[in-house]
Amino acid sequence: MHGPRPTLQEIVLDLYPYNEIQPVDLVCHEQLEDSDNETDEPDHVVNHQQQLLARREEPQRHKIQCMCCKCNTTLHLVVEASQENLRSLLQLFMETLSFVCPWCASGTQ
């Protein structure tokens, strides 16, 4: 359309009747290139996974709340450890490791 209003010369009508159904080719004839070096995952997913793995390996601060084994006072600890070392510490908590508060350790209570 040229101008603000359509004119009759610009309107094209297809006035041929369709009496028979014409088949439509739905097959895509696109050829894909070989992708031996590419992975199925997008780059941002791979980068996110690498960041998570790197974060697990580097030490991070973790807050631990536990009880004194003598007087049951709540103790707050902050440790800096990797995920693997933190799991080892938690395993020790489950088995034999106990904490003593500073008052019980000094024997003033």
From Swiss-Prot:
Location of the motif LXCXE motif: 26-30
Pfam families per record: E7
Recorded GO CC terms: host cell cytoplasm; host cell nucleus
Modification(s) after translation: Highly phosphorylated.
Motif (Nuclear export signal): 86-94
Keyword tRNA-binding on entry: no
Origin superkingdom: Viruses
Keyword set includes Zinc-finger: yes
Zinc finger map (unnamed): 68-104
GO biological processes: DNA-templated transcription; symbiont-mediated perturbation of host cell cycle G1/S transition checkpoint; symbiont-mediated suppression of host innate immune response; symbiont-mediated suppression of host type I interferon-mediated signaling pathway
Record localization: Host cytoplasm; Host nucleus
This protein's UniProt keywords: Activator, DNA-binding, Early protein, G1/S host cell cycle checkpoint dysregulation by virus, Host cytoplasm, Host nucleus, Host-virus interaction, Inhibition of host innate immune response by virus, Inhibition of host interferon signaling pathway by virus, Interferon antiviral system evasion, Metal-binding, Modulation of host cell cycle by virus, Oncogene, Transcription, Transcription regulation, Viral immunoevasion, Zinc, Zinc-finger
Subunit and partners: Homodimer. Homooligomer. Interacts with host RB1; this interaction induces dissociation of RB1-E2F1 complex thereby disrupting RB1 activity. Interacts with host EP300; this interaction represses EP300 transcriptional activity. Interacts with protein E2; this interaction inhibits E7 oncogenic activity. Interacts with host TMEM173/STING; this interaction impairs the ability of TMEM173/STING to sense cytosolic DNA and promote the production of type I interferon (IFN-alpha and IFN-beta).
Record's comment describing the protein's domains: The E7 terminal domain is an intrinsically disordered domain, whose flexibility and conformational transitions confer target adaptability to the oncoprotein. It allows adaptation to a variety of protein targets and exposes the PEST degradation sequence that regulates its turnover in the cell.
Protein family (similarity comment): Belongs to the papillomaviridae E7 protein family.
Name of protein: Protein E7
Source lineage: Viruses, Monodnaviria, Shotokuvirae, Cossaviricota, Papovaviricetes
Gene behind the chain: E7
